[in-house]
Amino acid sequence: MTATLEHTNFTVRDPKATAAWMRDVFGWKTRWEGAAIAGGYTVHVGSTHTYLALYAPENPRPAGESSYDTVGGLNHVGVLVDDLDATEAKVRAAGFKPHNHADYEPGRRFYFDDDNGIEFEVVAYD
């Protein structure tokens, strides 16, 4: 049996704006968007086989404690890219600040936080 991650669902301030920078930075496409089942609005953005569901509720609550200290918290999203340097330039152009650069076997990585407070790890393997 093979299991593959198909999607994850995140609460964001503005799904359309978040999807826009993800399309620009990662080259993804919008697969679907519309009214969410529980109210609010959702955009699905990603590749042919995997995506992120970006959800904005009608009445959002502010973020709580650090996700690294909260059971069930999202710590970061890892995205594999072919060209780390080109992706970092796109991250900067989108207005985000890369940090925690590191080389490790078998590749290189950096992190950035988006305007929703979600941390992304961008990695390229040698």
Predicted regions and their residues:
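Vicinal oxygen chelate
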Residues: 88, 92-126
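A short, acidic/glycine-rich surface segment
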Residues: 38-39, 60-65
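Core segments of cupin and vicinal oxygen chelate
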Residues: 2, 9-52, 93
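Eukaryotic phosphotyrosine signaling hubs
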Residues: 5-7, 73-76
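Short amphipathic alpha-helices within nucleic acid-binding modules
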Residues: 21, 85-90
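Conserved beta-strand in the GNAT
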Residues: 53-55, 121
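Exposed loop/turn and edge beta-strand positions of beta-sandwich/beta-sheet ligand-binding modules
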Residues: 39, 73, 106
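Short hydrophobic/aromatic beta-strand micro-patches
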Residues: 9-11, 78-82
